[in-house]
């Protein structure tokens, strides 16, 4: 006869890997063309002047310059790059 009960199983014990989303270059910081400014899911913040949108909704700089966040039309947030 066994002296211990069976170990059983659990439905817990796993976790997803971190996705490292968020702002990578704050407003006022100087960036080069191609620098990632923001990683996000969906387009909570849209690209403005001199900023591009990647296929995973990443916003990046198209020119060298300074990052500027602003509220666009209908209270939509936008990111501009002011050329230096």
Curated annotation (Swiss-Prot):
Cellular component per GO, a single term: ribonucleoprotein complex
Matches recorded under InterPro entries: Ribosomal_bL27 (IPR001684), Ribosomal_bL27_CS (IPR018261)
Molecular function in Gene Ontology: structural constituent of ribosome
GO biological process, one term: translation
Lineage top rank: taxon: Bacteria
Keyword Lyase included in the entry's annotation: no
Region Disordered, residue ranges: 1-20
Keyword list, A-Z: Ribonucleoprotein, Ribosomal protein
Pfam family, one: Ribosomal_L27
HAMAP family for the chain: Ribosomal_bL27 (MF_00539)
Stated family: Belongs to the bacterial ribosomal protein bL27 family.
Protein name: Large ribosomal subunit protein bL27
Source organism of the structure: Chlorobaculum tepidum (strain ATCC 49652 / DSM 12025 / NBRC 103806 / TLS)
């Amino acid at each position: 006869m066994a002296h211990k009960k069976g170990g059983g199983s659990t439905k817990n014990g796993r976790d997803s890997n971190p996705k490292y989303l968020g702002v990578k270059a704050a407003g006022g910081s100087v960036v080069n063309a191609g620098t990632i400014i923001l990683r996000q899911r969906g387009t909570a913040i849209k690209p403005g002047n001199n900023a591009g949108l990647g296929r995973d909704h990443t916003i990046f700089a198209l020119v060298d310059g300074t990052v500027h966040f602003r509220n666009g039309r209908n209270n939509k947030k936008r990111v501009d790059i002011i050329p230096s």
